[in-house]
Regions:
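Ligand/substrate-recognition segments at binding pockets and active sites
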Residues: 28, 230, 373, 377-451, ...
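Extracellular/periplasmic solute-recognition and catalytic clefts
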Residues: 29-30, 226-237, 254-312, 336-337
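Extracytoplasmic/peripheral linker and loop segments enriched in polar/acidic and small residues
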Residues: 41, 168-169, 335, 370, ...
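N-terminal lobe/hinge region of extracytoplasmic solute-binding protein
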Residues: 51-101, 139, 216-220
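Aromatic- and charge-enriched surface segment that lines or borders ligand/interaction sites
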Residues: 95-146, 177, 267, 315-317
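Gly/Pro-rich hinge or "lid" segments in bacterial periplasmic/extracellular proteins
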Residues: 151, 159-165, 169, 174, ...
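Structural transition elements
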Residues: 345-382, 400-405
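Long beta-strand-rich cores associated with HINT superfamily self-processing modules
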Residues: 522-550
């Protein structure tokens, strides 16, 4: 059942913001003063219980869209490469690879004796089928453009060539060749993305697009899908046919759907979870004092943002109005007093830490807040709004205390600086996705983007006109041209310059409002072993184990 929409009258927002700031002051601390985990029960060393955020939208590798979906898929499927503990690509289904002298051909050698979870032999052609399916317009994958560097991929996505002409071939059962338009320095990281997973052709032939369900899904990962209890959890069990099964320590993993961080925290303290998806802001101070050894915080290549619906008023063809709203968001105050978990104020789109790239910023980033307000008021009036005729706008976001606090705070900033009247509308995550994609009701919406691989192109691509997850509908031919040139650019310095120019251009257009850069935040029980923090925040369950407290 969808969550009841939350509507807040604009007149109450300043008072609500004050309440938010006061609540953040004491952290909403639990009464217990113990220094370690409480609620401990006997440890089941064979079953890991992971908090996993909102319920996944799909477990189909080529169709899934959300972070919570990809977390599960990484346990059910394995690509040619995987992500190592340091966030860098490592060998996975492919035991080795070679790269041509010109950087345009990668030849992957599969491990000997690979099998699907049902025992069928896994061959190189299964990777060809999976990647052809990814770019096939009939699949309607929102990640189709991720293979754009591959020969003919862009033309196939546009429907101009058949999927059979994709530059991925299997000359024999253990060799996958990926041919590129031009060198792509991030290709190995891209091959670790779940959307490039192999496809089990008999399952597709038998079940069609409904193959990714319990009792039907055949994967090649360390685990097999066992159950999906809607509104509760997804259960997976160990796959004895996985090539590295002897090193898998867990028999089962349960991924619990956790929409609200505070609820998830209560489950963790009660001993119902071993790992949390996030950490609640209102209890953060208490957690730092009492659960410091269980708290993991690490930089992450991810951006929290508000998107504008550019297909309809009031933001269609109104870059000045969009800029005005961005100018008056006090990101420093927001991250220190409202979120308070170490997030970094975002004055650009690409986070710090991306390899071989200098993140760009809004041109107003050096200005004082008072200077920003003066410019914003002039832009607001130029767009036709005033105290007598205020902008009335709605922010949509998925349910959760943290998202609500942020929306309340931003609405208060807009009201105080410009007189904007804002209504807030909270809905269940999948309902929010549907609202955004329909583009008939949303005006401003909350979203986030996690880099699929350690390269600025992973962020730049999201704003490309025809990219499947371009939620704002942003379309600038110059921006698209810069990205198209970057894709085929062999000179790394020139490629970097093109991507940096593209980011500056996009920021000037203001199709979205970057608010902060994430840090990954997890609570992890002392009896969980093998966890490695990294900038892409990827942890495979096969690398984890349970035992006595560390």
């Amino acid at each position: 059942m969808p969550a009841r929409p939350l509507r807040i009258a604009w007149r109450s927002i300043p008072a609500l913001l004050a309440a938010v700031l006061l609540a953040c002051g004491d952290g909403g601390a639990p009464e217990s003063k113990g220094k370690g985990s409480d609620g401990q029960a006997a440890i089941d060393v064979t079953t890991l219980r992971r908090g996993n955020g909102p319920e996944p939208d799909s477990l189909d590798p080529q169709r899934a869209r959300t972070d919570s979906s990809l977390n599960v898929i990484r346990d059910l499927f394995e690509g040619l490469t995987a992500v190592g503990g340091d966030g860098k690509p490592v060998a996975a289904a492919a035991e080795s690879w070679t790269v041509s002298a010109d950087g345009r051909e990668y030849r992957f050698r599969l491990r000997e004796g690979l099998r699907w979870s049902n025992g069928d032999p896994l061959v190189a052609g299964d990777f060809v089928v999976g990647m052809r399916r990814l770019v096939d317009p009939a699949t309607a994958s929102q990640y189709a453009q991720i293979l754009e560097p591959v020969v003919n991929a862009a033309a196939i996505v546009r429907g101009e060539r058949p999927p059979s002409e994709l530059g991925v071939v299997a000359p024999d059962a253990r060799t996958v060749i990926v041919r590129l338009v031009n060198p792509a320095p991030y290709l190995l990281g891209l091959m670790a993305h779940p959307s490039t997973s192999p496809a089990h052709s008999p399952s597709l032939a038998t079940h069609g697009e409904r193959f990714a369900q319990p009792g039907r899904l055949v994967g090649n990962g360390a685990f097999v899908l066992e159950e999906w209890v809607v509104g509760s959890h997804i259960g997976v069990r160990r796959n004895p046919n996985y090539w590295n099964d002897p090193r898998t320590r867990l028999d089962r993993v349960r991924f619990f759907h956790t929409n609200d961080p505070s609820t998830e925290f209560r489950q963790y303290r009660a001993g119902q979870l071993d790992v949390t998806y996030v950490v609640p802001a209102e209890q953060f101070a208490w957690i730092q004092e009492n659960l410091a050894t269980e708290l993991h915080i690490s930089p992450q290549l991810s951006t929290y943002y508000y998107g504008f619906n550019l297909s309809r008023p009031p933001f269609k063809d109104q870059p000045g109005l969009r800029r005005a709203l961005s100018l008056v968001i006090d990101r420093e105050r927001l991250t220190s007093a409202v979120t308070g978990l170490g997030e970094v104020p975002a004055y650009g789109w690409v986070p710090q830490g991306v390899s071989g790239y200098t993140p760009q910023q809004f041109d107003y980033a050096p200005l004082s807040y008072d200077e920003r307000i003066r410019e914003a008021r002039a832009l607001y009036q130029a767009a036709g709004y005033s105290d007598e005729r205020p902008l009335e706008v709605e922010i949509r976001y998925n349910t959760g205390e943290a998202h609500n606090r942020i929306a309340v705070a931003i609405a208060a900033m807009w009201k105080e600086a410009l007189g904007v009247k804002t209504s807030l509308y909270a809905e269940e995550f999948r309902a929010l996705l549907a609202s955004i994609q329909a583009r008939t009701e949303t005006e401003i919406f909350r979203s986030s983007w996690i880099g699929d691989f350690d390269d600025a192109y992973s962020f730049a691509q999201l704003l490309q006109s025809d990219f499947g997850i371009n939620l704002t509908g942003y379309s600038n031919p110059r921006y698209d041209a810069l990205l198209a040139e970057a894709v085929v650019q062999a000179d790394t310095a020139r490629r970097r310059a093109l991507l940096e120019e593209a980011e500056r251009l996009m920021l000037a257009d203001h199709p979205l409002l970057p608010i902060y850069f994430y840090v990954s935040k997890h609570l992890i029980k002392p009896h969980v072993h093998g966890w490695s923090d990294n900038v892409v925040n990827i942890q495979y369950s096969r690398s984890l184990s349970l035992g006595s407290d560390q």
